[in-house]
Design a protein with these regions (language model features):
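Short alpha-helix boundary/capping segments
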Residues: 12-16
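Basic, ligand-binding patches in group-transfer machinery
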Residues: 20
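Structured, basic alpha/beta domains of bacterial-type, RNA-associated proteins
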Residues: 2-9, 24-142
Length: 142
């Protein structure tokens, strides 16, 4: 029996669902907001909020746990680990490393939500998608 098992299956197998949520979470943390279907947005919300909660802890184990849940791709910006500043281009004379989604999550996003106890994302309804009339949504970091 499946009593009290609450998750959105999205009509996909478990491995496909995990890959989809990882991809959506990575894009959400990269751009701050994404446009997707309502069902995917509702499935992404608890997934992304759990990752932000891990980032707020900030220890090594939390970093390793969060690395399992997102793709650690580069964002195209540069990061100064000493001052935690983000630069658009590499500057001369500074030790800059390329900013990845995981670094952005633990350095920038976790500090923004340090005083907040949940509710890190919001979902806006959008007009239905043209073609198949699927309910669309905009999910963004608060």
């Amino acid at each position: 029996m499946r009593h009290q098992t609450k998750k959105h299956t999205l009509g996909k197998a478990q491995d496909q669902r995990k890959a989809l949520l990882r991809s959506l979470a990575t894009e959400l943390f990269t751009y701050g907001e994404i446009k997707t279907t309502m069902a995917r947005a509702k499935a992404l919300r608890p997934y992304a909020e759990g990752i932000i909660t891990l980032a707020k802890k900030g220890d090594l184990n939390s970093r390793r746990q969060a690395a399992k849940f997102i793709f650690d791709k580069e964002t195209g910006k540069f990061f100064d680990p000493e001052t935690s500043k983000v630069y658009e281009t590499a500057e001369e004379g500074k030790k800059l490393v390329s900013q990845t989604v995981l670094r952005k999550l633990f350095s920038t996003i976790s500090k923004e939500y340090s005083e907040r106890n949940g509710g890190y994302t919001r979902i806006f309804r959008l007009p239905p998608r043209r073609g198949d009339a699927t309910d669309m949504a905009l999910i963004q970091l608060v």
